[in-house]
Amino acid sequence: MRTQVIEGSIAALRRLYVFPDVAAKLETLLRDRARAGAYNRITSAKALADQLTNDLQSVSHDKHMRMRHSAKPVPDDPPLNAPPSDANKADMRRMARQLNAGFVKVERLDGNIGYLRLDYFLHGDDVGPRAAAAMTLLATTDALILDLRQNHGGDPATVALIVSYLYDAYAEVHINDIYDRPTDSTRQFWTLSALPGPRYADKPVYVLTSGQTFSGGEECAYDLQTLKRATLIGEVTGGGANAGGPVKVGTHFSLFVPTGRAVNPVTKTNWEGVGVKPDIATTAAQAFDTAYLQALRAQRKRITAQDAPHLSREIDQALRTLSRTP
């Protein structure tokens, strides 16, 4: 079992890992550790997976790279660039519906501030209608708090969809690139000119981040920050920018191998290993109140009691409530 998993991992890394030079270092590490008997006393399959994950990350510093053990045999890898099987499509549809395509909460807060919590950027037919529904509810709010504190990633195309809603239809904004090693190609992501829901252009956006924000969640935050389209509030994010997928390396083992890397068109780099640094640093727990306070204060300057008495009272009450929050 150990030899199969180690050799399978080495072969997968050689063939697919986005950084070939690091793949060579990982091969040396695994062979040296195996020769030294580092894995001989491990009897639990899960413990072996955990140890291999720790060893691989100690050199790669790639948080996406993880070994997993499955009680059921791992299916064979599909051919490169093969479309998803019917079973995979059904699984993705089921997950999207169970998780509401990642849309956890959409709300109009007192003071006419919009709030959207997104925990995943899932792919599938359910995403577009839910995004349109969310943006329809938020359309008449005056500022948006986009909560990515528990966002663990997903499809970069869905990130591009959400970012597109924050720009006018005529805007042609280059959001992100992803280089893919197996095909030696780069895929570009731009804002979309046609969307099914109302846009949220030219209004303030505040993005909440935490140390748990990862992968696609980080991309969204990084994209909006580098484009100067949003103010980031919260904690430094997890630091995972290399895209990929699971590869079978043993009968019951799969290794997530990052095959691509994000290349931001503005910075020409990404957030791998360092995370996305917020514009306003605070704890994850305080991020919402901090953003809400900023949005309300901006509203207070813009809205007068004479022009909008009901909204003005809402703003004042919300500010008083926040001032009493410990």
What spans do the regions from the language model cover?
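Low-complexity, Gly/Ser/Thr/Pro-rich intrinsically disordered linker/tail segments
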Residues: 269-326
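A short, well-ordered alpha-helical element
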Residues: 124-142
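STAS-typified acidic loop motif
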Residues: 100-128, 266-267
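Terminal peptide-recognition signature
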Residues: 9, 56, 116, 146, ...
